[in-house]
Amino acid sequence: CECFEHNPYYKETIQNATRMLKSGGMFLFTCATTGRPVHGTKSLEEEGKRKFSNWKTMPNVIKENWDNEYYKNLTENDIRECLDFDNEFETYHFEIEENHHDLFFWGIKK
């Protein structure tokens, strides 16, 4: 999964994904974190097209009646507030990829 920064219900999504994960299953995701420029909002796409002749919109962003302007770079603390990771996962790890400002997570469910 690489989209939680666009999901206003990321907490509920993480809780539900963890709930549905079988014991021994792996939960793996990345998301934008501090330092990543806002991307993938309709207004930003329109602005980019006006400012840059070489602007390319990813196909998944082109949708009729798309009005999602929600965007939030997520931190490890934001994710940790979603659930008790020590209670849910046998082992897990957070890592930040500094070049692209991505937060990585993997965990094995108890």
Regions found by a protein language model. Give the residues of each.
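A short SAM/SAH-binding and catalytic strip from SAM-dependent methyltransferases
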Residues: 1-8
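S-adenosyl-L-methionine-dependent methyltransferase catalytic module, highlighting the catalytic core
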Residues: 8-22, 26-110
